[in-house]
Amino acid sequence: MSKVCQVTGKRRIVGHNVSHANNKTKRLFNPNLHERRFWVESENRWVRLKVSNHGLRVIDKCGIDAVLADIRKRGERV
């Protein structure tokens, strides 16, 4: 599975490692992803999502039902 947050859409970005001598080499910055299960009361089932730490905070703020509706509106299957 890809390294993309299902809630916020955060994904890997490209940057540089910078040495003390200021040499730069390409590297990847990965989002802080976690595979989490959420209980959805309205559907009476568990939903498994790959979310970043920011995505977890969005779920805490808006609620899992609103977040799932947003994900489904984008066309993702949950």
From Swiss-Prot:
UniProt-recorded name of the protein: Large ribosomal subunit protein bL28
PANTHER family, per database record: 39S RIBOSOMAL PROTEIN L28, MITOCHONDRIAL, LARGE RIBOSOMAL SUBUNIT PROTEIN BL28M
Gene Ontology molecular-function annotations: structural constituent of ribosome
GO cellular component: cytosolic large ribosomal subunit
Lineage: Bacteria, Pseudomonadati, Pseudomonadota, Gammaproteobacteria, Methylococcales
GO terms under biological process: translation
Provenance organism: Methylococcus capsulatus (strain ATCC 33009 / NCIMB 11132 / Bath)
Family: Belongs to the bacterial ribosomal protein bL28 family.
InterPro entries named in the record: Ribosomal_bL28, Ribosomal_bL28/bL31-like_sf, Ribosomal_bL28_bact-type, Ribosomal_bL28_sf
Keyword terms of this UniProt record: Ribonucleoprotein, Ribosomal protein
Coiled coil: none
UniProt keyword Ribonucleoprotein present: yes
Domain of life of the source: Bacteria
